[in-house]
């Protein structure tokens, strides 16, 4: 993976270029328009010589007749080229932003779960929105400035040398001095830009935490805490912005001082008799006006460095994510529908970034069509076992088999298609009820199938009371639904999926007693002829399981039926006694 420090600005831009290249036609048109725009400005200045020497000098009064027409024509050309260049650059910029966001979005969807465990949602959102916008807007803005101001400088130099090479050659000493000034501030600009992007991620994260947890903030009186946190990161962002302004502001007067010294020397040199003999009023006016006109593009080119560095710093941040390794999907085996035999053999697993294994030497068989329940205290490793079946994480040692084959032999899509998951943390999308139930497969299922799944999940009662029934939009993460209603939508989703392997991770935890009793009947029906792994704190929901496995600190300590484990008077019996007070 590339390190930010290892990539120079040029290397970063070269890597970005393939993203821009498909839209180079727009860049070419914009470039031509910008050059014509700059040429019109330069030509406008050149008109001062005939105007002063001939027009007002009364040697050729016809100049005063055709000059206004030329000026009008140049202004029309300037307006047209300005519009064309702005439109084309915006078109290219929009395409680049869209392409970068698509690449980021697609790459992130292929990242392992461990990646999201380490990254805050706010930071990742900032990368997709703010940073990708910075790449395009900064780069396109810099391109406009470089082409237009660069063409202006070249045009002005050519005109100045044409009219008086003696005076113009003095300005050549400007080039290396300006180059040194730009190089000095470049590194500073890029470092500040990287800090600004990181701080923007912190601002987004802080705001997102408050917005998502606003109820908790209100209940626990966390307004002051959240305000202080947001103020802190906002002030940090302000300070980084001021550092950028400071660096940019220092470079401006330096360039202007260098240019003013050159202008002063030109005025002094113009007083030499050998130089004055070849100068007219028009010539000295054109040359001197051109030198003054050079100040603006030189200043713009100095500032463009900060703008370009901002874009390249954002680009490096995005490339860091794009260089991150995606989920390993090296399996070749594809299966339409598994029988459902699942087996853990001597499995040890440690979460990335941790030293202590979450699971140690797990041996577990879940025969096809049978129900195995995992029981244990919070943090014992029950949900971890379930997440390994879907290969959200890869194990350290041992192997996990499905139908006698290692899970790593299957393609991820084929493997995960065999599993339906209902967890305690239900995520619903800002879409209709029907589309949430048939998520990712809306075209595969009929309306009747969706309704049947909702009915079996005992969800139609509250769905029918909604304004638009199954077509009701339920808001972000089902904000318009109660916890129990959200859980039943998730169960309906699993019923409709009809996968041979079912994972119920606290599937009824958010339901009241009456709803739980009703939904349990549906779950019992759903579990028939399916391999089911049930994780539950409520022991009453797993008494009928074919086998109950007790997990303690990542190790299986007991296994057996409900009655067997009660008679054994071990950990399960203690948990049962705590819940039922026996």
Swiss-Prot record:
Residues annotated for ATP binding in this entry: 376-383
Alphabetized InterPro entries for the sequence: AAA+_ATPase, ABC1_TM_dom, ABC1_TM_sf, ABC_transporter-like_ATP-bd, ABC_transporter-like_CS, ABC_transpr_lipidA, P-loop_NTPase, Type_1_exporter
EC supergroup of this enzyme: translocase
Domain named ABC transmembrane type-1: residues: 28-310
Chain segments annotated as coiled-coil in the UniProt record: none
Subcellular localization: Cell inner membrane
ABC transporter domain boundaries: 342-578
Domain of life: Bacteria
Keywords assigned by UniProt, alphabetized: ATP-binding, Cell inner membrane, Cell membrane, Lipid transport, Membrane, Nucleotide-binding, Translocase, Transmembrane, Transmembrane helix, Transport
Record GO terms (molecular function): ABC-type oligopeptide transporter activity; ATP binding; ATP hydrolysis activity; ATPase-coupled lipid transmembrane transporter activity
Catalytic activity, as annotated: ATP + H2O + lipid A-core oligosaccharideSide 1 = ADP + phosphate + lipid A-core oligosaccharideSide 2
Topology in the lipid bilayer: Multi-pass membrane protein
Any Gene Ontology CC annotation: plasma membrane
PROSITE patterns membership: ABC_TM1F, ABC_TRANSPORTER_1, ABC_TRANSPORTER_2, MSBA
Enzyme Commission numbers on file: 7.5.2.6
CDD domains in the cross-refs: ABC_6TM_MsbA_like, ABCC_MsbA
Membrane-crossing residue ranges in chain numbering: 16-36, 63-83, 153-173, 253-273, 275-295
Subunit composition and interactions: Homodimer.
Domain notes: In MsbA the ATP-binding domain (NBD) and the transmembrane domain (TMD) are fused.
Family of the protein in this entry: Belongs to the ABC transporter superfamily. Lipid exporter (TC 3.A.1.106) family.
Function: Involved in lipopolysaccharide (LPS) biosynthesis. Translocates lipid A-core from the inner to the outer leaflet of the inner membrane. Transmembrane domains (TMD) form a pore in the inner membrane and the ATP-binding domain (NBD) is responsible for energy generation.
Descriptive protein name: ATP-dependent lipid A-core flippase
Protein's organism: Shigella flexneri
